[in-house]
């Protein structure tokens, strides 16, 4: 990481059993009446989901789904008071998915289907944050509203293409998406706090003909960090509503007991082929 008064730059990398990636990020603070900045970021990543979820590493598990995510983004943001900011950006992404249509196939003799997305994006994001801790807050609130416009091209190549049967599908795609995230913590005396959480996602994205391709690329609701590492089709949809509560007890200033419960409501109809099983 480099930092010089108004300029910051960083190069980061991650390596793990199911995920690895790299990010190059740089930001410069602009000399304007309202505090503002311009930034550029580039990300290259690969994530694998296995046929069976295991807590510890096992190299004998077949890779059921592989996601590649490569994108470049330019951003401009400015402050709104001391607790809020507005951000606008444009970007380009090359996304690639490789997957099996079923998890009951012979992984050694069956090839994976293959989809690619070449997408341009515009984004606007508003954030207001008064939480007293980035990971484990006990007071304050946070509201984030994100609007995205996407256009590009989708290509589906079935595994049968490797066997000499050409059946590639191409489709132009354009859609809009809005996401709202709300978190707020209410004190209930000196020791008890009740947190509330609401996540709403709405999208105009149309479904493609392949069920698994839709599910693999659909946004996922991840209530905990651990859920980001395994594939659950019941937590994926182009539009959803999630609401939850976070009861917590403050033992001392830097020690707390907290738990969380949430309910997820999915929207959107996916046509499931009879041979697909999860």
How should these model regions be labeled?
Residues 1-131, 219-221, 233-241, 255-259:
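Gram-negative/organellar outer-membrane beta-barrel architecture
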Residues 23-27, 50-58, 98-106, 137-139, ...:
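Outer-membrane beta-barrel translocator domains and adjoining extracellular loop/strand segments
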Residues 46-48, 94-96, 151-153, 202-206, ...:
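Feature marks short, surface-exposed loop/turn motifs that line or immediately flank catalytic pockets
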Residues 112, 119-252, 257-262:
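C-terminal outer-membrane beta-barrel translocator/porin domains of Gram-negative envelope proteins
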Residues 256-277:
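C-terminal/domain-terminus segments
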